[in-house]
């Protein structure tokens, strides 16, 4: 059954918001294996609020780390050794898995998220900004994933419409253009569900 990994071209591009929207649209389970930074609430808490799925669909993290930085360093600061065996995929479907930061963020000193994605062998949705710099960041992300044999499902944009940038990324990167979420003035479940329905086709995630 359906399962996707959500990564981003950078931190703060809208991965969690998109993950919540996709989780709700698919009535999926959501899992973020490593949460680094707890002060502003965990991403799973935001997804639980925005996705509109049963509480049991929002799975607990394998690791909850205190410092909001790359997981490899957050683990070191907490005195935790990250065991990759503990981030094996849960046996539930449909499933939306959210990474941290971008594809080349280190999970350990020797392993990036892109390496983990290759191990999981699930299709990856790249969440990208539409603003200045996104072409470079997006194409670098595509290259990094392809170099590891990671299947790319497509790119989901977040932000104001920038037709040329969106089209250029997908043409040069030879990836599917899945749609775009606008910036929402009011971020709640009904507004997010409507924005996803207007910007994406759920059948593209079947």
Curated annotation (Swiss-Prot):
Gene3D superfamilies: P-loop containing nucleotide triphosphate hydrolases. Keywords: ATP-binding, Biotin biosynthesis, Cytoplasm, Ligase, Magnesium, Metal-binding, Nucleotide-binding. It is an enzyme of class 6 (ligase). Its EC number is 6.3.3.3. Disulfide bonds: none annotated. The keyword Metal-binding applies. One of its GO terms (cellular component) is cytosol. The active site is at residue 32. The keyword Protein biosynthesis does not apply. InterPro entries: DTB_synth_BioD, P-loop_NTPase. It catalyses: (7R,8S)-7,8-diammoniononanoate + CO2 + ATP = (4R,5S)-dethiobiotin + ADP + phosphate + 3 H(+). Homodimer. This is ATP-dependent dethiobiotin synthetase BioD.
